[in-house]
Amino acid sequence: FTPFLFLVVSCVLNIFLDILFIVPLKMGVKGSAWATVLSQALAALGAFVYAFVRYKELRFRKEDLKPSGSLIYEHIRLGIPLGFQWSNLFIGIIIMSAAVIPFDMIDSTSMVAGNPAQVGYGISNKLSAILMGIFSAIGTALLSFISQNKGAKKYDRIRKGFDFSCKLSIILSFFCVTLGLLLTINGAYQYFFLSKESISEASIKYGNAYLYVALPFYIALAFIYIGRNTVQALEKPLFPLLSGVVELIARTLICLFLPT
């Protein structure tokens, strides 16, 4: 619960600093960036201080400064595949964003007013990211749960945690798909992120098209998060790494050859 409190404090502080830097101080986009950095830095500092004060075993000692080759190797072996999962996600977003731009181009030198394809994709992607965050959180929680129980050799709890995560993800995927489809009615979700003047029939058309294709596959996405994090927690990092590479290649090829 304590990490959640630090997250809440970070969000509230971010909102307060956004208002302070943008309205009275008139710092614009730079002010918004500073607000984000400062709020996250202060929350991280608070979390570190709390952890070191509350848990004596986490405090630094002189012997901790001595590098351990085996420990460094384990961090790299397990950390790179896990980090690549997030890199894969954001690289994929960049690739897909580049594939959307041609839909707004009239010719090689001019574009459609308002860039409706980019606007529609961008906003639908934000909604999708919010809904996908549920499955990402389940996967992350499962990773920690399985890792701890593997260390404690409580393999029956690993099986129960895996089964429960699958059942919960199935239920939540139906909820997310239903909610997402309801929000596509008249492009309702776009009004959460944009002013009325920035929304057009074309932006709604493009955004809804993205969601109509993506939403039905949330159940598959949920099992991807569960499967990857389970295998990662069992210290088998090669398979999540290879699946991430395959996913990135597939995403790239689809963006290159499928759009028309």
Q: Predicted segment positions?
A:
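Small-residue-rich hydrophobic transmembrane alpha-helices
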Residues: 2-3, 118-184, 221-243
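Hydrophobic/aromatic residues within transmembrane alpha-helices of membrane transport systems
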Residues: 9, 21, 28, 38, ...
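Alpha-helical transmembrane segments and their lipid-water interface positions
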Residues: 14, 18, 22, 43-51, ...
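Short alpha-helical transmembrane segments in multi-pass integral membrane proteins
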Residues: 26-80, 146-217, 260
